[in-house]
């Protein structure tokens, strides 16, 4: 899958967006307000071998009337794909199968977890104690980047 940029011709309009930071252990989840101004953390989902993690994302989307899903695509700093890239793409594919009417966008998430970790360290939160929160913060970082880029693309 290729990373995407917001495109006015395919934008679903007003409504909540869901941001996902997909990891092998945890999945950080963030959501926007309906006007797409601010991303806020929702929860951290435990990654599972069965589809319980996918089903939880589906439930969050349905409960919040999500109109678009933004999944962070972890690529190496040099731009090459890794096993984490493949895992995120597979997770996005499974979500798309469950929610075929909701666009699922892949965005470059390089440095999102690092940015979230640095922010937590700067605020005095230990990364070991705050791992679940860091995953949520990374999802917020991914989604907020999409919202900000979307706003510029639509104006």
UniProtKB/Swiss-Prot annotation:
One of its GO terms (cellular component) is cytosol. SUPFAM superfamilies: Ribonuclease H-like. Pfam families: RuvX. It is found in: Cytoplasm. GO terms for molecular function: nuclease activity. Keywords: Cytoplasm, Hydrolase, Nuclease, Ribosome biogenesis. Its EC number is 3.1.-.-. GO terms for biological process: rRNA 5'-end processing. PANTHER family: POLYNUCLEOTIDYL TRANSFERASE, RIBONUCLEASE H-LIKE SUPERFAMILY PROTEIN. Could be a nuclease involved in processing of the 5'-end of pre-16S rRNA. Belongs to the YqgF nuclease family. This is Putative pre-16S rRNA nuclease. It comes from Corynebacterium jeikeium (strain K411). The lineage of its organism: Bacteria, Bacillati, Actinomycetota, Actinomycetes, Mycobacteriales.
